[in-house]
């Protein structure tokens, strides 16, 4: 008799709350779930696609120093402590996240890449992955944007003879030395990378519009106003603008130095790409060995496609952190909670609403599923 148990699909593991993603937003939600009395394992699980702690920060370019990164707010319950601001941001944040997971005994399973979330029996949501599946009473999706770099199309892009890369591919200025680099984009990454690259080689900056520069400090009131503007968009079902698009760009010493050497003399967007550069309809031409697309990212929400959440305008309508069309699902790290401080607040808010939802009469507390150990993760 042949034992074919290995080929049989595992039954879903019942869990109260499944958190998808272990970046700033996911860890914040996990912390507040523990504080709210959810037990690690049967109460909640965190499913992370990466092989180690750190979220998107693990993949930031090595030359990005912690002191030059967007302000990183500490996770709830554990200060960052004294940090060497000249250390690579990727290492500092990854070490901090690892310590955080250990300190609060968070049930993070990795690498687990969630491929789909879909309706299941008994008012559950089925969270699917190659490592197994979970039947959750509520889901917190905190998958961020790093895995979905946005590459805008311009005529001739496929015929460019040089190298094209995105912010997500950038590893440092040294590999670009001696080549003329056209940097495309008007956000924080574009300006940061221009400041680095223009110190070692020639550059041209191309962006649709001049960014809003911020010379002074960004206080708490300005932060609240910026978040409110992004929140208004998602409440109306529109795709969210990036938080930095409403906060403006800080003029750091490195940015000021780049400005002084002429690297921030912006050209409008080109009309097409030619094999040896970029061109405008008015006859202008700039040669290029490299085109660096600092054109941002989109929310990584493909795993939610089976739930049909999109509004006609392309966005997902939100009520706070809750998806209007699916009250068992919360999105954090999306829209107004895309910043580190926004993610912390969103984690607290999502857990509060989940606890209220699961306490309502008629919401089943258990499923007739065979209790099994969680799927093993290599």
Each predicted region: which residue ranges?
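Glycine-rich flavin
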Residues: 64-85, 233-236
């Amino acid at each position: 008799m042949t034992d074919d148990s290995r080929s049989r699909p595992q039954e879903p593991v019942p869990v109260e709350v499944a958190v998808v993603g272990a970046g700033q937003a996911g860890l914040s939600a996990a912390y507040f779930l523990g504080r709210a009395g959810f037990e690690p394992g049967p109460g909640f699980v965190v499913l992370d696609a990466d092989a180690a702690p750190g979220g998107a920060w693990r993949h930031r370019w090595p030359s990005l120093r912690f002191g030059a990164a967007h302000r990183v707010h500490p996770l709830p319950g554990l200060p960052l402590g004294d940090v060497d601001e000249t250390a690579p941001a990727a290492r500092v944040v990854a070490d901090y996240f690892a310590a955080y997971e250990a300190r609060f005994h968070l049930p993070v399973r990795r690498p687990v890449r969630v491929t789909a979330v879909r309706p299941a029996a008994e008012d559950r949501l089925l969270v699917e992955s190659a490592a197994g599946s979970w039947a959750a009473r509520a889901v917190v999706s905190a998958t961020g944007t790093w895995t979905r770099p946005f590459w805008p199309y311009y005529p001739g892009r496929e015929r460019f003879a040089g190298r094209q890369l995105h912010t997500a591919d950038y590893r440092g200025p040294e590999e670009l030395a001696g080549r003329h680099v056209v940097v495309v984009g008007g956000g924080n990454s574009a300006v940061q990378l221009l400041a680095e690259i223009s110190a070692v080689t020639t550059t041209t900056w191309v962006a649709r519009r001049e960014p809003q520069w911020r010379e002074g400090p960004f206080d708490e009131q300005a932060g609240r106003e910026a978040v409110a503007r992004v929140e208004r968009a998602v409440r109306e079902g529109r795709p969210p603008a990036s938080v930095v698009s409403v906060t403006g760009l800080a003029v750091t010493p490195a940015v000021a130095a780049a400005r002084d050497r002429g690297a921030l003399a912006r050209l409008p967007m080109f009309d097409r790409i030619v094999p040896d550069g970029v061109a405008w309809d008015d006859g202008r031409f700039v040669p290029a060995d490299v085109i660096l697309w600092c054109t941002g990212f989109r929310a990584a929400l493909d795993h939610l496609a089976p739930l049909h959440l999109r509004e006609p305008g392309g966005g997902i309508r939100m009520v706070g952190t809750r998806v209007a069309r699916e009250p068992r699902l919360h999105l954090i790290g999306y829209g107004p909670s895309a910043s580190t401080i926004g993610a912390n607040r969103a984690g607290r808010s999502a857990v509060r609403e989940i606890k209220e939802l699961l306490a309502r009469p008629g919401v089943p507390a258990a499923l007739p599923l065979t209790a099994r150990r969680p799927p093993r993760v290599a």
